[in-house]
């Protein structure tokens, strides 16, 4: 064996052993039997490239892809186990239906294996029952930021062009909706202006509610490298409500009270405007920005009826705050521009127009910042009782100075600490506020950067538009021009698409509870574990009139409360694509056949589409008392369709689709179960052997989808190109990706919009504004702010539920490094399970001593809504201050979302999982 072969074999063996896969001695000398191919990691929004080895129909090893620009050959601990997530002992391999002894569906029955045909028969029956009784609003789809792009696009098309419902919403509503609103309100277009290259180019990394060391560990390795490259110059600051691993290399750690990030941002802005006006980039502001604001009295996204029959008495005092709050000294000071004082009742009069905004003058903007002095902000925000007020003030000053320093490049990163927030959209806007004031946005090494949580929350949920109000490429159902564009691309009649936005994710749950939705289909997520105030939704799922379908790979909580479970193919058992946090789109090929009778979510969507004729769905449909969708059947006939054509025929197996060659050269040497079937000879939804669709369905879906963005600043490359590269950052124009958007040096569309300028914020959403002051708009005449961004003033407001005498602790939830989301996959990897076998209740030693607790004691964590048992950890990786506990949500045996509050940001409808009040006592 020569030196090169020795190194190669050693590397392969090392990668396999890291991933927990044994390497027989025979393999050590014959790795050429392994077939390697590039793919994408299944987990977070970082978008790491990986290499996958397959042998004898199984994935046998994974390793980091050295050619991948995101991770450069590294993986985190989860990434190394991409192979093992696929082969858990309880992998779902056949459809399961609740049935009685006679073989009939029975809501109270036990799960029994059934054929795909029997599963789809019952699914069709129950769907049509709800659809015919309640109309297009009577059904719902829980989608995902973990859909492949093709899966999400197929689901969106079936729902909005087929069923004419907008009740499809992804679990990305839980993670990125506030970021989306922040982008759309500020820039007029979604997704970051910067890219990961900013890490190597910046002088300062400031994390806000983003424990990157655990949640984006590969990006954190790049941050660490940058810090080590120049210890004196490069500064790292970690702002959090509790101490975590991201603080380990931080120059400054700032522990603040929950929700007071709003006040800290306004303090920084005040420092700039009042005390360092020379730091303001006045030319940038004048040429490229306007000042704006909106209403403050917008509620907290809870039900506005505290007397709803499903509420327990203990819940009502919190829910009452949806309509009115009593202002304390601190909140009254922040809202003083509205003429209020401490003790006033503050009514939420603008819940229905939370997203309305208008232009204000710089003088009004400055007036809004007036209360946020260092003294006020430090008093309001200091989160650690062990820290002196003076020390906290010094940290705030140091933080402001880092932003203000004239030639210092600054990147602000955030994730769920910002987004899962009752004012999440506001705090996103505030980050841009400070960066715009300083002219430190959309420049290499400087910018406010929202990090994505899920692997395709950007690529699928946001870009495809699988939200209840959206269409692809930032279009929305409420806009008639956007509907027209979509209907033309989809080749469906005008007025097919429902113009009324549907129910967001949490509201689908509420609608199930209220009987407004009676059929729900869950795809690629676990809503009954991931949604706050879960006791309500468990009861709703088990209501006799409701029918729940869950497509999944393992039996998680959602599957356990379902009526029908469909076994889904996992990531490398199908073709797909993801889009990451830096706008990088990456594709992969099917590597192995699915386990058992599992099939892809795309296949499930298309097979279900076969069950519906146009005359059943494109007829006249009542939406509500104000809106009835017209029949479009005559128009369909004029387009060459028959009313007896199925949605599959029209939407997915049309003439264009069938033009995509199933034997395309790009697919040579790889399986494609959806296109050709496979050796398992699966009995399909019609009871016959499924032999494939006979056309390259994934390529068709991709090429049709990309039509939405071409020429509109969302340009994507063709299907084949992505299989030759390690991803591209859109917009991709003339074969070239874009690193920094809105900057005319780098962005084709910015240059096109403003050829004689340095920047152009060319997004066109909400770019017609009226004028007003801090209180309200003052005229109805709109003016254009084309190519400009908004600098928002948003006040500090407190969370609706805060610690009290009865419930004295804040509760925050989140993730840990070793597990992904609800743990459905990672808890089945033995090595990851052994590393972190249960979710712990992290708390301070002082609180533990006060409660008479020892390390490892079992405690009850109880709120007004529910309680769970968890084991106390006072010495672990997370170190909360006195008065706060942190419990991750990956463990279904520590079902923490029974405890959390279903309050949301009223603009984004994203749940605040970081703030509710609990009591802790020994179990």
UniProtKB/Swiss-Prot annotation:
Annotated binding of Mo-bis(molybdopterin guanine dinucleotide), by residue: 78, 146, 171, 175, 208-215, 416, 420, 526, 551-552, 574, 601, 813-822, 897, 914
Signal sequence, start to end: 1-30
Keywords recorded for this protein, A-Z: 4Fe-4S, Electron transport, Iron, Iron-sulfur, Metal-binding, Molybdenum, Nitrate assimilation, Oxidoreductase, Periplasm, Signal, Transport
Alphabetical list of PROSITE patterns matching this protein: 4FE4S_MOW_BIS_MGD, MOLYBDOPTERIN_PROK_1
EC code: 1.9.6.1
Catalyzed reactions per annotation: 2 Fe(II)-[cytochrome] + nitrate + 2 H(+) = 2 Fe(III)-[cytochrome] + nitrite + H2O
Residues annotated as domain 4Fe-4S Mo/W bis-MGD-type: 34-90
GO annotation terms (biological process): Mo-molybdopterin cofactor biosynthetic process; nitrate assimilation
Annotated Gene Ontology cellular component terms: membrane; nitrate reductase complex; periplasmic space
Entry cofactors: [4Fe-4S] cluster; Mo-bis(molybdopterin guanine dinucleotide)
UniProt PTM: Predicted to be exported by the Tat system. The position of the signal peptide cleavage has not been experimentally proven.
UniProt GO MF annotations: 4 iron, 4 sulfur cluster binding; electron transfer activity; iron ion binding; molybdenum ion binding; molybdopterin cofactor binding; nitrate reductase (cytochrome) activity
Major localization class: periplasm
Pfam families given in the database record: Molybdop_Fe4S4, Molybdopterin, Molydop_binding
Residues binding substrate: 889
Binding site for [4Fe-4S] cluster: 41, 44, 48, 76
Subcellular location: Periplasm
Entry note: cofactor: Binds 1 [4Fe-4S] cluster. Binds 1 molybdenum-bis(molybdopterin guanine dinucleotide) (Mo-bis-MGD) cofactor per subunit.
NCBIfam families tied to this protein: NAPA (TIGR01706), PRK13532.1 (NF010055), TAT_signal_seq (TIGR01409)
Function recorded in the entry: Catalytic subunit of the periplasmic nitrate reductase complex NapAB. Receives electrons from NapB and catalyzes the reduction of nitrate to nitrite.
Quaternary organization: Component of the periplasmic nitrate reductase NapAB complex composed of NapA and NapB.
Family, as annotated: Belongs to the prokaryotic molybdopterin-containing oxidoreductase family. NasA/NapA/NarB subfamily.
Name recorded for this polypeptide: Periplasmic nitrate reductase
Organism this protein belongs to: Campylobacter jejuni subsp. jejuni serotype O:23/36 (strain 81-176)
